């Protein structure tokens, strides 16, 4: 297995390469992903993870069909890597790829629903402690928020809705 979760077959004699490619194709396996081409798309487990915010499998499949399969015969200036991460935790390192997608949720507090609880569940749920009660109302600094989505649905009064 490679770091991009592909199989690498070593030791195939040069004169058997075409036969090997044909054999793999007959069994539903694609070859490629080497050289100056789009490499296989990688993704995290997405919504099956407790932190997953987007369906990485569905998105990766669309990207795979469009770019890996669709650009299979296109020679690029260099290898092109794509990764899809389901949240800002960065498990598959989308920001280190040529194209990276990171699932995010931007909270939009509803000040009408905030009751200024002394033990605010939104404050408690944030891993970077961004939400604060200011004058008895919830405030989330948009510049400091990491958009991890852990606050969604935590307020029993709906001050931060499920989006």
Where are these regions (language model features)?
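Ferredoxin-like iron-sulfur electron-transfer modules
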Residues: 45-48, 67-72, 76-79, 100-153, ...
């Amino acid at each position: 297995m490679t770091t991009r979760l592909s199989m690498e077959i070593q030791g195939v004699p040069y004169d058997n390469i075409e036969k090997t490619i044909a054999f793999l194709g007959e069994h539903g396996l694609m070859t490629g992903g080497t050289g100056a081409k789009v490499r296989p798309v990688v993704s995290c487990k997405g919504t099956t993870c407790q932190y997953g915010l987007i369906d990485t499998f569905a998105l990766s499949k669309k990207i795979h069909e469009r770019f890996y399969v669709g650009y299979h015969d296109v020679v690029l200036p260099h290898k092109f890597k794509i990764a899809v991460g389901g949240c800002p935790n960065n498990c598959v390192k989308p920001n280190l790829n040529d194209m990276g997608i990171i699932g995010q949720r931007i909270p939009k507090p509803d000040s009408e629903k905030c009751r200024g609880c002394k033990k605010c569940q939104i404050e408690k749920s944030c891993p970077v402690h961004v939400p604060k009660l200011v004058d008895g109302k919830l405030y989330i600094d948009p510049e400091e928020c990491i958009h991890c989505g852990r606050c969604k649905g935590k307020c029993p009064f709906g001050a931060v809705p499920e989006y």
